[in-house]
Design a protein with these regions (language model features):
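C-terminal catalytic-base region of ester-bond hydrolases, centering on the histidine
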Residues: 101-176
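Serine-dependent carboxylesterase/thioesterase catalytic core
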Residues: 1-10, 14, 18-106
C-alpha cells in the first residue's frame, strides 16, 4: 500500500489492518515518507514488488500520490501486478493505468485537495471509477472505500466485473 505525499506507512496502517483482518497480506511501502518521485523511490518500489511477487502478482493500492507511483510501477512491471486501486489520485491523462492491468479509481467530488475530475479516467473492459462521499484525507478511513477495496481484491484473477455496491451500502456511492 502506497501512501500519499508526506504520508508514511503509519498513514495507511488502519486500512492495512482492515485488509489483514480479511486475510490479505497487506504491507506498507517501506520507503519512509513519500516525498515524491525519484530514483530511490523507483528502485525501492521495484525491489518491494519483486519481494512480494514470489506468491504471484500483487495488487497495488495507492492513496493520492501513492496511486501515481502504483500506475508507474504497473507500467514497468505489468506481469507482477494483479490490479491497481487508486484513492483520490490525480491521474489525469498522464497516469492512466495500463490496459492489461485491472484498475479502479476511487474518488470523491468533495475531495478538497485533488480536483475530482483528475481522478476520473476513461473506463474500459477492466477499468472503472467509483465515486464515494468523503474527504481526501479521510479516504483511508472511509468504510465505503474499504468496501470497494475488499470487493476488488476478492475478485478472481480471470474474471473482472465492475464494482456493484451491496443494496445496504448504495447510499455511500452517489453514482452507483
Amino acid at each position: 500500500m502506497l501512501p500519499g505525499l508526506g504520508g508514511t506507512d503509519a498513514t495507511t496502517a488502519p486500512l492495512r489492518w482492515f485488509l489483514r483482518q480479511l486475510g490479505y497480506g497487506a504491507v506498507g511501502w517501506g520507503l519512509g515518507r513519500n516525498e515524491g518521485f525519484g530514483r530511490h523511490v523507483t528502485a525501492g518500489l521495484d525491489t518491494r514488488l519483486a519481494s512480494l511477487s514470489g506468491g504471484g502478482p500483487a495488487s497495488l493500492i495507492g492513496w493520492s500520490l501513492g496511486g501515481l507511483h502504483a500506475v508507474k510501477l504497473a507500467r514497468r512491471r505489468p506481469d507482477a501486478v494483479r490490479s491497481i486501486i487508486t484513492l483520490g489520485s490525480p491521474l489525469g491523462d498522464r497516469y492512466v493505468p495500463p490496459a492489461v492491468v485491472p484498475a479502479t479509481s476511487v474518488y470523491s467530488r468533495s475531495d478538497a485537495i485533488v480536483p475530482w475530475r483528475l481522478s476520473v479516467v476513461p473506463t474500459g473492459p477492466r477499468r472503472e471509477c467509483v465515486e464515494v462521499r468523503g474527504s481526501h484525507l479521510g479516504l483511508g478511513h472511509n468504510p465505503a472505500v474499504a468496501l470497494v477495496i475488499a470487493d476488488r481484491l476478492a475478485q478472481r484473477v480471470d474474471v473482472w466485473e465492475p464494482f456493484t455496491a451491496p443494496r445496504w451500502a448504495r447510499r455511500w456511492y452517489p453514482t452507483g
